[in-house]
Amino acid sequence: MENLIIYAFIYLLGSIPFGLILAKFFAKTDIKKEGSKSIGATNVLRVVKEKNPKLAKKLAIATIILDFAKAAIPLLTLKFLHYDQALLWSVAVLAILGHCFSIYLLFEGGKGIATGAGAMIVLLPLEVLTAFIVWVVIGKIFKISSLASLAALLAFVVSSFIFNYDLEIHTHAPVFIIAFIIVYKHLPNIKRLIFKEECKVI
């Protein structure tokens, strides 16, 4: 029963669309109706930038921090309280599911990058560092957020086998589930990348 309460709480917390809330409150803009219609930091930056570039950067950074924290803080807390790895991985997946398929937005949501990073920094920090380096390099070269994110995701999955071939839960299934969710949410971006129609944001 305790685990079910934790799972429900994490999903509901992960579902909070911080980007949407911040853009509506501070920029009076509904990012669900503009840009890519995503609730993540990239769309916050893209949409708000048209009206107020300085505010756009602040709101995008705040969105990243809050989306990151809504997974990282609960996982850190549960890890500190010595909950087992199986529960921690379940919580990680649920936090990302909540962000990508928010109950508050009729199961629409963001792309899962910041929330995924927040979850994984607790469980696989070295892999997240590797992914971040790849994200920065690809972002600097191509200036395309989705391409950088997908490259970072690939680096994360590959490095999870290099640095942690045998995870404590004895399976990489949660890593693949998380990767699948994020790739699924990026399918429109992948299509635009293939046809060279993806916008440069970074």
Swiss-Prot record:
GO terms for molecular function: acyl-phosphate glycerol-3-phosphate acyltransferase activity. The chain crosses the membrane at residues 3-23, 87-107, 118-138, 144-164, 167-187. The keyword RNA-binding does not apply. Its EC number is 2.3.1.275. It catalyses: an acyl phosphate + sn-glycerol 3-phosphate = a 1-acyl-sn-glycero-3-phosphate + phosphate. GO terms for cellular component: plasma membrane. Pfam families: G3P_acyltransf (PF02660). It is a multi-pass membrane protein. Pathway: Lipid metabolism; phospholipid metabolism. It is found in: Cell inner membrane. One of its GO terms (biological process) is phospholipid biosynthetic process. Keywords: Cell inner membrane, Cell membrane, Lipid biosynthesis, Lipid metabolism, Membrane, Phospholipid biosynthesis, Phospholipid metabolism, Transferase, Transmembrane, Transmembrane helix. It is an enzyme of class 2 (transferase). Belongs to the PlsY family. Probably interacts with PlsX. Catalyzes the transfer of an acyl group from acyl-phosphate (acyl-PO(4)) to glycerol-3-phosphate (G3P) to form lysophosphatidic acid (LPA). This enzyme utilizes acyl-phosphate as fatty acyl donor, but not acyl-CoA or acyl-ACP. This is Glycerol-3-phosphate acyltransferase. It comes from Campylobacter jejuni subsp. jejuni serotype O:2 (strain ATCC 700819 / NCTC 11168).
